[in-house]
Amino acid sequence: MGETLPQQLPNMNAVSQIIAQQKLAAIMEQVCSDHVPTIITRDTQPSVVMISLEDYQSLEETAYLLRSPNNAQKLMSAIKQLENDQGVERELLE
């Protein structure tokens, strides 16, 4: 028997394996264009999540940047500054 999915999954779609097989191309297009993951439920196996490669790479990069506690602290501090309108705009070096 498959696992029970949480009642509320914000910003996620869910489809059965059968529907996913029938509408694979459309689901892949939606996942890539909307950047909203889709859960594919299976009767006797654990569910899987389909996300775009772009979103996966973004998650991996975020995890990498937050791995270092010092780097994570600096990033969180910078985010707070931006949220409080204390950010400084700078030109990028090429």
UniProtKB/Swiss-Prot annotation:
Protein name (record): Uncharacterized protein ssr0761
List, alphabetically, the InterPro entries matched: Antitoxin_Phd/YefM, phD/YefM_antitoxin, YefM-like_sf
Q: Which organism is it from?
A: Synechocystis sp. (strain ATCC 27184 / PCC 6803 / Kazusa)
The Gene Ontology terms for molecular function here are: DNA-binding transcription factor activity; sequence-specific DNA binding
Q: Which Pfam families match?
A: PhdYeFM_antitox
S-S bridge residues: none
Q: Which family does it belong to?
A: Belongs to the phD/YefM antitoxin family.
What GO biological process term is on the record, naming one?
A: regulation of DNA-templated transcription
